[in-house]
Each structure stands twice: as C-alpha cells, then as structure tokens.
C-alpha cells in the first residue's frame, strides 16, 4: 500500500556532480578559445546580455488579460451559490467593469490566444464577434440596471408593468447570448476564440440562474421557470465540453521537441487554465436548486510559471520538451510547501568579473493536507553543491511571490546562465504577517530579471499584495541545460482558495476536493482531472476504504450536515461514509458511464445522502463497494450541506 500515492513516478535520477574548477581565469585570455569572441570586450558582452535579457513574450497586454481572468474567478468564488440582495447586483457591476468597460478587453482576450498559437483570426470573424459582444454588453447593462431598480423598490410598488419590463430585458439578454455564442466558435477559429467563448458562456449561465432566483417575483409561470432551468443545465454541459475539447486541441498543437516549444506549450496551459478552465469549474455552482446557499469551494490544480533563465534564446541548450514534461510531477495528493534546500555551484567567466555562483539544484519538502505529520522529500533536481547548501523553511506559510536575479558568463566559448538570487514573499494568514526569505548565491548576483507577478498577477490591486495575491508556491524543480551550461528552475503554484485546514463552514455548502485526502488505500490513486473539476481526482479500482480526509468543523456553532459526493462510475456502487472509523451514512448509487468512456461533464453525478449527521470527529473515510474486475469509480469532491 502506498498511502500517500507518491510512487515511482516521483523518482528522478540524480546527475553527477561534474565539479567546476575554482581556479578560474580572472582576466581575458591572451588567445581567445572561440574566434567569435576575439574582439568582444567586457562592456560589449554586458550590452549583448542585457539586450537578450528582455522577456518580449510577457507583454503588459497579456498580463492585463490574465489579471482580468483571475479577477473574474476570484469574484465568482465570493458569490457562487445563491447570493441574495445587493450582492448579486454588486457582482454584475464589478464584472462589467472588469471585462466590459469597452471592447478592448475582448480584443485582448483574442490577441492573447493568437499570440500563443501564432495564428490570426480573420478580420471578418473578429469583427463579427466584437459586434455581437457590443450588443451583449448593451443588453446586460440594461438588464442589470433594471434588476438594481427592482431590488431597491419596495414590494408594494412592484406592479405588472414593472414585472413585464424586467422580464422583457432578461429575455432579451438571455436570447441574445444563445444567438451570439456561435460567433465565438467559428469553424477553424475555435481555439483562438476560446477565452472569449468561456467568458461569454460564463456570463450567459450566470444570467440564466436569475430566472430561478427571481422568476416567480417577475411573474413567470412555473413552466417558464422550469424551461429556463432545463436550458441552463443543457448549456452548462454544452459550454463545458466545448471548452475542454478545444483547450485540448490547442494544447496538442503546441506539443514539440525543443525547450522553446515547451515554454510556449506551458504558457498556453497556464494562461488557458487561468482564463478558461478555472472558470468552467465554477459553472455547476450557478445551479441554485442544487446550491441554495453560498458555496465555499477550492481550486487545487497546479500551474507552472516560465522557467527562470537569463536569456530568451538558449540556442538549443535549454534541455528538451520531453525532459521537462516527463519530470513534472504526475497527479498526486495535494500538498503544501515546507522547505527548499538550495544547492549552489560556481560558474567561472571568461572575463573574470562575470563569474558568479548560481542555483545548481534543489530538494523540496512538502507536507500533505492536514491530518498527517509526514514530510515528503523530493528526489534531487539538478547538480549538487560545490558551495554550502541553503535551507529555507516555509512551514505552510503562503509564498505569494518570487523575484529572481540571473547572470550570464562566457566560458570558455559559450554563454552560461544561472539564477543567482531569489526573494520569496510569504504571508501568514493566522498572524496576518508578511515577510520575506531569500536564496542568495552571494557572488555577483546580477540584476532582477524575473517576477512571478508578471505571470500570476493578483486577484485585486485594491489591497496590499499579501492580501490581494492570487497564487501560492507549492513546488520547485530544477533542470539541467544541455552541455552543462547551467540550470533552469521551474516553479509550481496553486490557487489561493485552497484551505489548509479543510474547514467546514456551518452556514455555507463546503466542497472539499478528495485530492486533499492525506491517505489513500489499496486500489485508490490520483489521476488527472478531466479539465473541468478544478484539479485532479481520485480513481478507485478495488472495493473497500478509498481515502481518508481530515475535516475541521466549525466548533463555534452546533450544526448538522448532509453529504454529497461528485462521482463517476462504471457500475452501480455503494458509498459508505465513516468518521474516525464509525460508519454513519451508506447508500447505493447508479452507474454513470461505460468502461472505456472518456470523462465528460455528464459522466459525473451527485451521490446524495439523506441522513443528517454531526461532525463529531475529524477523520472522514470514504468507502466504495460493488466494483467488479475492470470497474472504476472516480471521485471528485465531497460536499457538506448545512441542515437548518
């Protein structure tokens, strides 16, 4: 049994030390080993490296697009479920100010994907989409204005005329979305329009739910309200599957063999996660019949920032696509950054004063989700030290920013790159204190050339960064450049919504991804999520206890809950829930898929338990029975619904 599901795939062969001699040349050689460097003096070298140290692909426009996507998701996480009163109008207002102050954000959404795919949308298609978006903006603004007035007016002043007016504006906006969505999925441009499609789909679904909240007040017949609900369910599935399909198509097109192709591949994966996949993970929560209360949920997926390098064009020395992709961590139980041990080596320089020390390799230690005291230490990445090691301990504090210095040297006839210093900004949300820790190679550290905020901007700029940040660091890897020309660190981040303590809210519906379990039993493993779950999922192939997750109830309020499990299964099964080993809920649930089926939105169902329970313990076990040979059960989340 491998209780933490951390197995052979985490093993990376440690490279040999390949010590660099420290008796380096302090001044330029009388005879240059490389003829191309004969006439290159030190100032020219510095100018050359400075010119090559500008990251052209991370433009301010791209950063702004990503920030808007992150901001929309962050705002939604604060209102999903059933927001009452002014909270809904306030969200609409903020949302419109974010993505619809003009047509410029929508143009930027399109240009972002055009840059990633190195392909342009034809003018006719772009102009048609922008025209549709302008019409949608007008409709939505008119509807939100009417909704605001409706909420402000006393019930006694609401009459058939005002009811008819808001029904008219709602129906106009809703039907305009249905008619416009094909303009964001024009054949041949589906990938390039994907961010636009996802944002428009999100607005449509969020709008549709209002019929369930206000439909009766507005004077709709029950049959009309039911029809809107049926449409919402159908479009949630349609929009989700469209986004997943075309995300995958775009990602597959960018697979390559070189380091440069991996950088672009990873940028697409990261940026489309932030602007598309994170968004569609929230679509089901707009179903106010299933979620009649506010919802506390989390995004547990990982995103990787660009490698930290001192030059843009590594000219074939930046390792290979497969070398990086194959060694990225495979699906695993969620964990938190605990410690990084930095190894440092010396890089001599042809000009003497361009010599530097650099981050040559590292171990990283993590801790599983609450419930276990284990510390998991990674295999070694990179080259081991010729200098003293440095240990930075984070102990679960949230590292929300990394700023790196890099340097370059010529030795003896080629350019070497290294990361010389990294400042980590961290925040303790228990004490409300911000601080920094620094890896410092302590020799010729060069200039700042990389900042994680450029790629993972904050949710909001209205708060200090330690409060408004969007992501926290949870893993660090280091890859060797070809020809031993240095190392390339790559940092992994997760969303700030993740709750270390797995707190169960006594007033909200709490969703806990099962990937936050601290222990898996035989036959249970972590597999890649199907893109729309906000993270990876658990697969069970054997009968018995599947996973144990630690939960922290709200002890300030005595509350009972009902449980639901978001699952897919190839057979009819029985789920059993136990607290500290004592079963309290058990029921059988239907098969949802056939063996071999690809997981799509409709593959999953909710297993609802009717018997309320109190959280009298902390260790929640989920058991599965009813599986035969070849059967599989996939578990995404468990939900805790307060019983009033």
Curated annotation (Swiss-Prot):
GO biological process, one term: symbiont-mediated killing of host cell
A Pfam family recorded for this sequence: Endotoxin_M
Propeptide: 1-57
Molecular function as annotated in GO: signaling receptor binding; toxin activity
Compositionally biased region (Basic and acidic residues): 1-13
Coiled-coil intervals: none
Keywords of the record: Sporulation, Toxin, Virulence
Signal sequence region: none
Region (Disordered): 1-20
Role this protein plays: Promotes colloidosmotic lysis by binding to the midgut epithelial cells of Coleoptera.
Family: Belongs to the delta endotoxin family.
Other notes: Toxic segment of the protein is located in the N-terminus.
Protein name: Pesticidal crystal protein Cry3Aa
Designated gene of the protein: cry3Aa
